[in-house]
Structure formats: C-alpha cells, structure tokens
Curated annotation (Swiss-Prot):
Gene that this polypeptide is encoded by: RNF141
Pfam families: zf-RING_2
Organism: Homo sapiens
Functional summary from the UniProt entry: May be involved in spermatogenesis.
Cysteine disulfide links: none
Lineage, broadest ranks: Eukaryota, Metazoa, Chordata, Craniata, Vertebrata
Keywords: Lipoprotein, Membrane, Metal-binding, Myristate, Zinc, Zinc-finger
Topology in membrane: Lipid-anchor
ZnF bounds (RING-type): 155-192
Gene Ontology MF terms: ubiquitin-protein transferase activity; zinc ion binding
Expression sites by tissue: Isoform 1 is testis-specific. Isoform 2 is expressed in heart, brain, skeletal muscle, kidney and pancreas. Isoform 1 is not expressed in fetus or in azoospermic patients.
Protein name: RING finger protein 141
Length: 230
C-alpha cells in the first residue's frame, strides 16, 4: 500500500512543470531525511570537496552550527556552516550559513557535478593538465548555479514572484502571496509552523552577497545561504 501511494505521488510529480517538480522533490526529501542521514550528507560533502580540491590551495569545511540541531524540530532550526580555508595559512577567507533546504540543494548540485569531474579525472591519461582544465570549467558552472539559487530565490507558493520575505522556518514568499495568506492565518503555508507574534511573523530577508568569488570549485558554496561570522 505504501509503495502504491509513493508511486502515485511520483507520477503526479512527473507531470508537474520542471521547476515546481524540483521544489516538491526537495521538500519531500527534506521531510523524510533522518538526522543520521543528514549528518552523513554533511560528512560526504566534506569528503567530496576535499577530493575535488586536493590540488588546490583552499578547501571547504562543512559543519553543523553548534546547538542548532538540539531541538526536536531540528529540521526547522538546524543550520550548516560552510567555511573556506586557506590550506597553507589556515586563514578563514569566507563563511556562509545555510538552512536545511539550502543545504540539500547545494548537496545535490555538488555531488552530481563532482561525480563527473572525479570520473573524468580518474580516466585521464594526463591528469596534471586535463584535470586542471576540467575542474576550472566545472567550477564556473557550479558558481553560476549557486548565484542563480540565491539571487533568484522564488516564492514557495506561486513559484513565480521573487521572494521578498522569509519566515523563521526559512520558507520564503513574495509579498503578494504572503499578504493574502496572513490575512487569515498565523502560520507558515508550507510547514504550518505557528507564528507567535506580529512583530516576528514576517522577517525581511537579506540580499545575498558575492564576497570573494574566485574561479575554482571551492567557491561554489560562498553564495549559498546567508553570510556568517564564526
């Protein structure tokens, strides 16, 4: 029975426009993700980015922000910190903080693209020259994707208007949609998280920055999530 329901749901998703289907898939994935699987993905990103950037002077470090995963509602409040570190000096050059939804998007992008980069590098007869060229090209594509995810964040309701507001649960909406919803409801339209007060119900989201963008794979995460100071 459960498999039948799952198959029917997937059939419906397959008929949706690509943009909406991807959003639905990410929401479903974050909803079914266990805490152990989440930690496994954080560790996997550290491993994958270390392999891809093994010949570069900088590397990424993904960590769960201390205390953000201690609540029973960890999926709502958990934050993942991504730090770019210079290997030789140990200096932190950039740091970003992401919610669970943003982290899952970044995870899927990095792992899918890195698989191709690593496979091509392993079959190359001249890794020194070809590997460098492939990584540089791939990095540009990844950074473009991250910029798109952050600069053009869309409303979770209409999937059309640009997101103007973000709730404490990290779901974002355009002003038009959330105005209609908030006239009758005091909770999030997506996860139903209850808003406790008018002053903290709708929070204006900060525009993402483009600090320290470079031309290689390590900068893919610089624009994911929001700026973070350790």
């Amino acid at each position: 029975m459960g498999q039948q329901i799952s198959d029917q749901t997937q059939l419906v998703i397959n008929k949706l426009p690509e943009k909406v289907a991807k959003h639905v898939t990410l929401v479903r994935e974050s909803g079914s993700l266990t805490y152990e699987e989440f930690l496994g993905r954080v560790a996997e990103l550290n491993d994958v980015t270390a392999k891809v950037a093994s010949g570069q002077e900088k590397h990424l470090l993904f960590e769960v922000q201390p205390g953000s995963d201690s609540s029973a509602f960890w999926k709502v409040v958990v934050r993942v910190v991504c730090t770019k570190i210079n290997k030789s000096s140990g200096i932190v050059e950039a740091s970003r903080i992401m919610n669970l939804y943003q982290f899952i998007q970044l995870y899927k992008d990095i792992t899918s693209q890195a698989a191709g980069v690593l496979a091509q590098s392993s079959t190359s007869e001249e890794p020194d020259e070809n590997s460098s060229s492939v990584t540089s090209c791939q990095a540009s594509l990844w950074m473009g994707r991250v910029k798109q995810l952050t600069d053009e964040e869309e409303c979770c309701i209409c999937m059309d208007g640009r997101a103007d507001l973000i709730l404490p649960c990290a779901h974002s909406f355009c002003q038009k949609c959330i105005d209609k919803w908030s006239d009758r409801h005091r909770n999030c339209p997506i996860c139903r998280l209850q808003m406790t007060g008018a002053n903290e119900s709708w929070v204006v989201s900060d525009a993402p920055t483009e600090d320290d963008m470079a031309n290689y794979i390590l900068n893919m995460a610089d624009e994911a999530g929001q700026p973070h100071r350790p």
